A protein has these predicted regions:
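Short beta-strand segments
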Residues: 16-50, 56-58, 64-69, 77-79
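Short loop/turn and capping residues at structural boundaries
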Residues: 69-70, 113
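Extreme N-terminal tail/first-helix region
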Residues: 1-18, 74
Length: 114
């Protein structure tokens, strides 16, 4: 497979796609979840609930991996490794990012609010 350029990766990440988000479980294999993501200013944002296994895993070990798959027939894939950081809920930054993350996967503002 041909490696994408930085410009191609930036463009690829601007398209709403599903990502497989992996956290490190406490006593076994990685915990994998399909997630929505938002890419802005060289940062990937993923929304998770405080009650989720992902949150508990990340609280203990912030290491993450993501695999963002392209649609066939292009076959492109972007794989990312890094450390998660939590954002405080209820702040203007958090609310804006959460809205943009949600909105990008819906056809209209009304659908996103639904």
């Amino acid at each position: 497979m041909v490696q994408m350029s930085g410009f191609q990766i930036e463009s690829f990440l601007q398209t709403p796609r599903y990502a497989v988000f992996a956290t490190n479980s406490i006593d076994g294999p990685p915990q994998l979840t399909t997630v929505w993501f938002l890419y802005e200013s060289n940062v990937l944002y993923v929304g998770i609930e405080r009650s989720s296994v992902k949150y508990r895993n990340l609280s203990r070990n912030p290491g993450v991996s993501m695999c963002i798959d392209g649609e066939h027939p292009d076959g492109h894939t972007v794989v990312v490794y890094g450390e998660a950081e939590f954002m405080e809920t209820g702040t203007p930054d958090f609310d804006g990012i959460l809205w943009r993350l949600t909105r990008r996967y819906h056809d209209s503002d009304e659908d996103a609010r639904g």
